[in-house]
């Protein structure tokens, strides 16, 4: 059952928004499909996610809290931003303690010109088709780590739940542990998926 709710872009319904995220990551990862994510006026529709849990060997939270992953153990509904391979900034939404959802792809809807300038391409389907591309297109920095959605220009706008038949599911990408877990989710037919299912 979906726990989606209409939430304010800034402030207002912070408690309700946090409750939407205070669940296990696989459930939140599915519910986030079709929602709109915005960071400082730039964003789009979420079309691909991956779930990570504290008992998951592929998760940053698997060995417990560290200075790097502290946000994963913080309040639900916050951003966990980390540097991947020393190059790409990746955006996750924190759920229950130690749970997070990696945002893998967006269909850009807001701030396309700014995204294109940051990414060096104006091909819409390539602007946010992958976690590293999202980080670049949204202008993320490590200072964004721990930011609560609903503050500092970060927002998730929930829409109507996506029909089960429109949701794709498969193994996660780019990991060597627990690679068979079917915790990658996507919207069927989206041209902006990072990779085919």
Swiss-Prot record:
Task: Report keywords, A-Z.
Answer: DNA damage, DNA repair, Hydrolase
Q: What is this protein called?
A: Putative 3-methyladenine DNA glycosylase
Claim: Metal-binding is one of the keywords in the record: no
**Enzyme Commission number, as recorded:** 3.2.2.-
Which lineage is the organism of this entry classified under, starting from the top rank?
Answer: Bacteria, Pseudomonadati, Pseudomonadota, Alphaproteobacteria, Rhodobacterales
Tell me yes or no: is Hydrolase among this UniProt entry's keywords: yes
Alphabetized InterPro entries for the sequence? Formyl_transferase-like_C_sf, MPG, MPG_sf
Enumerate the Gene3D superfamilies for this protein: Methylpurine-DNA glycosylase (MPG) (3.10.300.10)
